Amino acid sequence: MVVDYENIANTIDFYALDGKRSFSRSYQIDFNVEPVRRLTVSATFRYTDARIEMKERGLTEKPLTSRYKGVLNLQYATNLNKWVFDFTASINGKSRVYSFMEGLRDENGKLLYKDGYSPAYPLLYLQVTKRFKGIDIYLGAENLTNFRQKNLLVGTPMEGTAGHGGMAAVNTALPDFDASAVWGPIMGTKVYLGLRYTLWK
């Protein structure tokens, strides 16, 4: 089953492959090492080639699917694992956006997807854990780069309104409204505090 957002304007088209091609090839490399005692370094790189044959367009790159992703994780634990420090950095590759997104512009009038692809973007995560007998207390932060997808809502701007980042609010009543064209983070930096309790071992 193909879910096609691009065949007919303002319409989601559902149809069977009917002998057409659809595939996803993924290649992944993993690397793990402990350069010094209690310090673990892990790295992963994945490349994805996902394509689907669309009506009258032939074999097309699957939209909103990242071409590649790289992840680096550093974890250090003190003696007896009383403290654990965890840092993760990732780079997320570009992905093809829907054709109706190619004309979208930012608050300065610049095209967001001039080549038809989303930008590559980095993400950083940090977590510190203090371990007691049967209880872990952890403090962490996600998306430390505070990267967020611009113009998350697609549609016709409403006159006389200003939304996030100075952009006009989108008219949700019109048929060109779309809130599903998501390729990146929609929330900025988030800090959290948690408690983990072990009932038994």
Regions found by a protein language model. Give the residues of each.
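Feature marks flexible
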Residues: 2, 14-16, 184-185, 189
